[in-house]
Amino acid sequence: SEMVKIEQKGYITNIFKSNLVNKDKNYDYVDASTVLGSSSKFGKGNEDKERYILDGNKVVYINNKGEEVTEAETALDVNKNFITTWRVNANDKIVLPFIVDQYFQGNYNCTIDWGDGSEKEHVGGENSTAQRPEHTYTQAGDYNISISGKCSYFVLSANAYSSTYPELLKKLIKIVSWGTVEAGGYGFGDAENLVEIAEPTKKTFIKCEDDSFAYLFAGCKNLEVIPSFLFRYVNENTTSFEGTFERCEKLTSVPEELFENAPNATNFEETFAYCKNLMTIPTNLFANNKQSNNFKKTFAGCTKLEEVPYELFDSTPNAIDFDRAFYDCYSLKTGPKIWERANASQISGNQRTYAHCNSFDKTGLSTDILNKYFK
């Protein structure tokens, strides 16, 4: 039988394709706790190396040795609703970060389930007043707010939301499901207690009309894990990941597959800047981003980095901006030799790529190289 790879969160196991529910189909990967809940006979779905894939209304389970394949029906459509979890105190009011402008009626036509048993609320559509939906919770707890229908924008930084409701930024703790809600632009910047992001389970991820994921999760300082296939369904014209994970202070690693489906991405400025606990960067992180030209401050302030693969930028022949790419990476000992690139003559100005990298091995480097890349 043909072998197939099931990949999730960095773990790869081979199983026989003939054992799968539909061997000719491209499978979607899913966190089983989202689909099945913690009472499933499959367990909680978060044990390391246990993996699940979704095929229609069947969930296929691969055990942690890759030797057993079972399946179960699920009544839950994980792809329908956009679901976020909020942690509230008694009598807290949650206001959702909808964009309130003249296009409100066209951007929203959705039903909101506030997750506490209260009556569902319809927002948007014709004759609707442009105002952010809000709800007060009588009891403290974690509540799943589920949105179905059309919800084009959900942006914590827009319309002065973050300055008007700074305390609400701390209450968003999970993105449980991305849903099919015609998402045009989302932003979770400075949601400092966001700890979990769902993997998209089919082509329903943010459309990003401006072709940018700029600062999408910037300042999510308690986020520990980025799903491997978070950007699996991005618009292929996506060009910018500027600041996407900037100041995600608890990240220790980055999945190698993260940007592989964004072949036209050009801008990685500050993408992981000030991720002060980041310890490893995979060699092939930018392997499919051959159009990239901007790595300004990409890893600046990543003070725990000690070694960066020499080949990290080898697949990006057009890149000419490495200004402060590893600035203030005090612990960094080795990294890409920018001065040996084929296009090194096109890299102009004082790059300061490794400025303040006090641990870096500078053996044999010329004064010109030191002045250009290390001062």
Give the label of every model feature segment.
Residues 45, 54-55, 63, 114:
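Acidic surface patches and DE-rich sequence motifs
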Residues 47-48, 54-56, 104-108:
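A short, compositionally biased
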Residues 53, 59-63, 68-70:
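Short linear proline/tyrosine/threonine-rich motifs used for host-factor recruitment
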Residues 1-35, 39:
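Conserved hydrophobic/amphipathic alpha-helical signal-anchor segments
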Residues 12, 58, 109-111:
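Conserved beta-strand and immediately adjacent loop positions that scaffold enzyme active sites
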Residues 66-375:
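Negatively charged
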Residues 32-46, 50-52:
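Extracytoplasmic/periplasmic/luminal assembly and interaction segments
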Residues 42, 52-53, 66, 76:
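Intrinsically disordered, low-structural-confidence terminal and linker regions
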